[in-house]
Amino acid sequence: MQSRKSLKPEKTVQTVFSWDSPGLMAGVDEAGRGPLAGPVVAAAVILDPFNPIMGLADSKKLTALRREKLYDEIQAKALCCSIALATVEEIDSLNILQATMLAMKRAVEGLRLKPNKVLVDGNRLPTLKILAEAIVKGDALVPAISAASILAKVYRDRWCGDYHLQYPQYGFAGHKGYGTAEHLAALRQHGACPQHRKSFAPVAQVLR
């Protein structure tokens, strides 16, 4: 992994150990379904039961500083982590739900260790060749899903920071691509950039 805080988006990023073990369970979650810009990011995490991580919770309930610290700790202590994304182009061609499922599928397939079961936050499942279960509010109930939610959220927030430097007029570093009043005003003033989701109504309106 890059040592600096900001990351360029990649299809898959992972940290692993080189040994396998039966009975492995992976938690999966996503970040970025709602924003008007940027990829949707998914993460899959297999935690080490002998190396626990304290303070795991739904990423939305944590401060940005706490998420950053847990991101590094998860990368260091988990047996295996994988982060993947679906691009803006894929979101526009597939729709956001199918793009989210694709990102989750890529995250699971990016794990070096093959889990016996996958627990996914929410009520939908990606198409997998592994036993999987959807857990509503799983990011608050299952530590591995909490860890995945933190990885996905931090990775995507860093992506927004990178693209803020490229397109400062939109304020991506602040609103993370969501449809805030500031973001909508910038869209009306500057039009859409290549990272805006053209299939989303507020973006489509300025392209007419």
From Swiss-Prot:
SUPFAM superfamilies: Ribonuclease H-like (SSF53098). A divalent metal cation binds at D29, E30, D121. It catalyses: Endonucleolytic cleavage to 5'-phosphomonoester. Manganese or magnesium. Binds 1 divalent metal ion per monomer in the absence of substrate. May bind a second metal ion after substrate binding. It is found in: Cytoplasm. Its EC number is 3.1.26.4. Signal peptide: none annotated. It is an enzyme of class 3 (hydrolase). The keyword S-adenosyl-L-methionine does not apply. One of its GO terms (molecular function) is manganese ion binding. GO terms for biological process: DNA replication, removal of RNA primer; mismatch repair. Keywords: Cytoplasm, Endonuclease, Hydrolase, Manganese, Metal-binding, Nuclease. Its cofactor is Mn(2+); Mg(2+). CDD domains: RNase_HII_bacteria_HII_like (cd07182). Gene3D superfamilies: Ribonuclease H-like superfamily/Ribonuclease H (3.30.420.10). Residues 23-208 form the RNase H type-2 domain. Pfam families: RNase_HII. InterPro entries: RNase_HII, RNase_HII/HIII, RNase_HII/HIII_dom, RNaseH-like_sf, RNaseH_sf. The keyword Hydrolase applies. One of its GO terms (cellular component) is cytoplasm. Belongs to the RNase HII family. This is Ribonuclease HII.
